[in-house]
Design a protein with these regions (language model features):
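Conserved SAM/SAH-binding beta-strand->alpha-helix loop
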Residues: 67
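Conserved beta-strand signature within the Rossmann-like core of class I S-adenosyl-L-methionine
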Residues: 142-150
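Class I S-adenosyl-L-methionine
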Residues: 158-161, 165-209
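S-adenosyl-L-methionine
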Residues: 1-39, 47-54, 75-103
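Conserved glycine-rich SAM-binding loop
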Residues: 44
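Conserved beta-strand/loop positions that form the S-adenosyl-L-methionine
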Residues: 39-41, 64
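A short glycine-rich, Lys/Arg-flanked "PGG" loop and its adjoining helix->strand segment in the class I
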Residues: 128-142
Length: 209
């Protein structure tokens, strides 16, 4: 972590951070109005959130991650660009659904390039598993979207199988259906690495039934 990132976590956290208590989070509680609310899980360096927030200032965005240097970098960018519609939650994503968000409170959930844990003995560490997807689906509004991207074909197939087993989610195929510019993503470091290695970029779009 750089000195600037460390200082951002200290100085800018009251402005952009969300406390790790057990209070439920809503758009009106965070932003003071009923704006649409999008949650990005694993925001990395935060560039995707910055780009979305700048393009759509009337939307509300929350980034969830445990990587503190990335949070510090994101807060520096938010402060420099005077962005007011992004908040950061430093918490394990597996703990936020139903603990921090109520049912039918989120318009969109974005999960871009989650760790595929390619070794079979590590598959249990993957975040996108049935219980996680069920709790996530409960927190989506009716007809809300779950948007996932990965460059791991095996992980993609596993995710699709989990979605097929979840009655609250409908897989939209082809995956670009409904992918309006509001949620077209910024190419992340991990996506760029996948492209450089010749991996296909696989998009999944599911909707709350």
């Amino acid at each position: 972590m750089t000195r600037a990132q460390h200082r951002a976590l200290e100085v800018l956290w009251p402005k952009y951070g969300i406390g790790d208590d057990t209070s439920l989070l809503t758009a009106i509680g965070i932003f003071g109005d009923q704006r649409p609310l999008t949650l990005e899980i694993g925001f990395g360096n935060g560039q995707n959130l910055v780009d979305l927030a700048l393009a759509h200032p009337n939307q509300g965005y929350i980034g969830v991650d445990v990587y503190r240097p990335g949070a510090g970098r994101l807060m520096l960018a938010l402060d420099r660009l005077e962005i007011g519609n992004v908040r950061i939650l430093l918490q394990d994503a597996a703990e936020v659904f139903l603990r921090r968000f109520t049912e039918r409170s989120l318009d969109n959930v974005l999960i871009y390039f989650p760790d595929p844990w390619p070794k079979k003995r590590h598959h249990k560490r993957r975040i996108l598993r049935p219980v996680f997807l069920h709790n996530l689906a409960l927190c989506l509004k009716l007809r809300g979207f779950l948007r996932i991207a990965t460059d791991c074909n095996h992980y993609c197939q596993t995710i699709l199988e989990c979605i097929a087993l979840e009655p609250l989610l409908t897989n939209l195929d082809p995956p670009d259906q409904g992918m309006e510019p509001l949620h077209r993503r910024t190419i992340t470091k991990y996506e760029a690495q996948g492209i450089e290695r010749g991996h296909p970029i696989l998009d999944i779009l599911a909707q709350r039934a």
